[in-house]
């Protein structure tokens, strides 16, 4: 309590991935129950082709597990990625209502996404109560 923590991914990523891979949603939630629920969680949603393009724009190929190749959805890694991500999106859709995830359209310009995040933060957290530590 009394701290602001920003992180990329959290227990919700494990909830989605483990559930899609066949684990019981209740079991996964109990497994990660030690991790506190955040006050705010943003879910950045982009079309699958946009997500794929962003990944491949930064490296030459998809990773085996991020494409869901372990599930045997398709022998084509890009097709498997799309099928796997589609399943993840369904789980995130359920978690949106269950945990109050705030969906941001990740197909917008980054400045617009940042503006929306800042507006939600400003409406939920009084940043003025936190003092930044000075680095020596």
Name the predicted role of every residue range.
Residues 2-4:
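Loop/turn-to-beta-strand initiation segments
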Residues 12-13, 110:
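Conserved beta-strand edge residues that scaffold enzyme active sites
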Residues 56-136:
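NTP-dependent small-molecule kinase module
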């Amino acid at each position: 309590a009394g701290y602001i923590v920003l992180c990329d991914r959290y227990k919700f990523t494990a909830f989605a991935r483990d559930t899609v891979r066949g684990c019981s949603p209740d079991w996964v939630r109990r497994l990660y129950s030690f991790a506190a629920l955040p006050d705010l969680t943003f879910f950045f949603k982009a079309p699958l082709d946009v997500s794929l393009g962003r990944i491949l724009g930064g490296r030459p190929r998809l990773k085996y597990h991020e494409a869901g190749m372990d599930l045997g959805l398709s022998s084509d890694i890009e097709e498997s990625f799309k099928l796997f991500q589609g399943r993840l999106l369904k789980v995130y859709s359920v978690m949106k209502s269950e945990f109050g995830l705030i969906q941001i359209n990740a197909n917008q310009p980054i400045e617009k996404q940042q503006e929306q995040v800042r507006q939600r933060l400003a409406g939920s957290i009084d940043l003025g109560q936190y003092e930044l530590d000075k680095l020596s």
